């Protein structure tokens, strides 16, 4: 009997020892799984909290920048000193101010200029375009000053006195047709110069560009005077009857 009891105890002891472990293992597994899931949930939730919210600049800073742009709307390009000054007023970095002005010149500035009656194309005209328009305006003003003379300008010319030949009604030779019809007329000014050198009483030579050539008329006058002098001399030499 004792041997049988010992045998039953030996047979039951392993089962009794193993049964609590088997009954406790599912609870431990569920607890570990819940802990792991909670940890993973925390890990997954961390990036959402660590992401920086995509917000805008403060309203006060934007107002300061817009006021500055309105004052300098015809040249909305702040210098480094002005950017530093705006950075101190708005508590923004220089890169934020530069980016804001880049976007504002494309989106805010055209509307701002149109509201105040200024076209953005005229306000932001480049240096080359302005120089080209200045040259066009100067070129347009030059012909107005040095244009062809009209009838009004011809009437305002000074009136020169007419030569003696025209006042007496004598027909003067045409200077344009004279060289082609009579080639010897070209040598007449030379004769006139010689006569003026030898005889001091002859009139001074007149350039052919200013007045027409009157050398033939002068020769006729000299010949008539000489003939009259000869006739008078002959009368004096004749004996009285």
Swiss-Prot record:
Major place of residence: nucleus
The keyword Transcription belongs to this UniProt entry's keyword annotation: yes
Disulfide bonds, paired cysteine numbers: none
Any one biological process term the GO annotation gives: regulation of DNA-templated transcription
Top-level taxon of the source organism: Eukaryota
Portion annotated as DNA-binding: 48-111
GO molecular function: DNA binding
Subcellular location: Nucleus
Keywords: DNA-binding, Homeobox, Nucleus, Transcription, Transcription regulation
SMART domains: HOX
GO cellular component, one term: nucleus
Span list, region Disordered: 1-56, 115-213
Biased composition (Polar residues): 21-39
Protein family per UniProt: Belongs to the TALE/TGIF homeobox family.
Reported function: May have a transcription role in testis.
Name under which the protein is recorded: Homeobox protein TGIF2LX
Organism from which the protein derives: Hylobates lar (Lar gibbon)
């Amino acid at each position: 009997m004792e041997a049988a009891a010992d045998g039953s105890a030996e047979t039951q002891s392993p089962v009794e020892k193993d049964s609590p472990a088997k009954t406790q293992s599912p609870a431990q597994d569920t607890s570990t799984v819940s802990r792991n899931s909670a940890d993973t949930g925390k890990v997954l939730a961390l990036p959402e909290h660590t992401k920086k919210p995509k917000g805008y600049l403060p309203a006060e800073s934007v107002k300061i920048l817009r006021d500055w742009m309105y004052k300098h709307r015809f040249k909305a390009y702040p210098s480094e000193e002005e950017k530093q000054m705006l950075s101190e007023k708005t508590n923004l970095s220089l890169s934020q101010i530069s980016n804001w002005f880049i976007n504002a010149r494309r989106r805010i500035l055209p509307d701002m200029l149109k509201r105040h009656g200024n076209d953005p194309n005229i306000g932001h005209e480049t240096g080359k375009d302005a120089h080209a328009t200045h040259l066009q305006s100067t070129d347009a003003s030059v012909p107005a000053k040095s244009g062809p003379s009209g009838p009004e300008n011809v009437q305002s010319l000074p009136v020169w006195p007419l030569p003696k030949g025209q006042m007496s009604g004598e027909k003067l030779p045409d200077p344009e047709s004279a060289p082609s019809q009579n080639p010897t007329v070209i040598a007449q000014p030379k004769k006139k110069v010689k006569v003026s050198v030898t005889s001091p009483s002859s009139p001074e030579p007149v350039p052919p560009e200013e007045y027409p050539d009157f050398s033939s008329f002068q020769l006729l006058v000299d010949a008539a005077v000489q003939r009259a002098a000869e006739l008078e001399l002959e009368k004096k030499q004749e004996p009285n009857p």
